[in-house]
A protein has these predicted regions:
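Interfacial helix-start motif at the membrane-water boundary
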Residues: 48-75
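Cytoplasmic juxtamembrane regions at transmembrane-helix boundaries
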Residues: 76-98, 147-159
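Hydrophobic alpha-helical transmembrane segments of integral membrane proteins
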Residues: 92-122, 166-170
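Terminal transmembrane helical module of multi-pass membrane proteins
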Residues: 133-184
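Alpha-helical transmembrane segments of multipass membrane proteins
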Residues: 18-26, 69, 127-130, 157, ...
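Alpha-helical transmembrane segments of helical membrane proteins, especially in multi-pass transport
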Residues: 93, 116-140
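Perimembrane loop-to-helix junctions flanking transmembrane segments
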Residues: 36-56, 182
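N-terminal signal-anchor transmembrane alpha helix
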Residues: 2-35
Length: 184
């Protein structure tokens, strides 16, 4: 008996409601926390522009942040819970994305949405395809087989994303914060 029959387009059917729930959460349930100064404030942006990142501390943090969800999803992908795990992952990712973007817009307005875009580039151009391949396998297995090419691609894409997030993204976000500090 098939409980879930999902295709590639249906992945968005779980991500988008999660995203909308994140927006609703920020606007209604977490509204009292939005008034507090946080990372989406002009003060934080001005401090970030002058901050130096310790690469030796940041690299292990990034590896944990990016590899742990990937490895957990990969481990579950070989069990009967793979479709449920993929759906929960998509809902959770959508929810956290909605919370993040809404919080940024609430705190900084248009600058906040642009900051979110800057914070995702360029590493998410590699993370997204890696996770989509793994999620697609979770959704379409056992009809789809995992192979060496998928493994190599996912590992290479994640490694490239981590390198870009470590070296390129901080400078991109710093340039963004300097640009908006000059215009303020």
């Amino acid at each position: 008996m098939r409980i879930f029959h999902l295709g590639k387009r249906q992945m968005l059917a779980f991500f988008v409601p999660g995203f909308l729930l994140g927006i609703i959460y920020v606007n209604f349930a977490a509204e009292k926390y939005m008034a507090e100064a946080g990372i989406f404030s002009d003060l934080f942006l001005s401090q970030f522009a002058d901050m130096q990142i310790d690469i030796r501390s940041y690299l292990p943090y990034l590896i944990r942040l990016r590899a742990v969800p990937l490895l957990l999803l990969a481990a579950v992908s070989f069990t009967r819970l793979r479709k449920a795990a993929a759906i929960l992952f998509l809902l959770w990712t959508g929810f956290t994305g909605g919370v993040t973007v809404s919080s940024a817009v609430y705190g900084l307005g248009l600058k906040g949405s642009l900051l979110c875009a800057a914070a995702l580039l360029p590493q998410f151009l590699f993370y997204i395809p890696a996770f989509v391949i793994l999620l697609w396998y979770c959704i379409s297995a056992p009809g789809t087989r995992w192979n060496r090419q998928k493994t190599i691609f996912v590992i290479a894409a994640m490694a490239a994303g981590i390198v870009l997030e470590l070296w390129v993204n901080p400078e991109l976000v710093r340039a963004f914060t300097v640009l908006f500090r000059m215009r303020a």
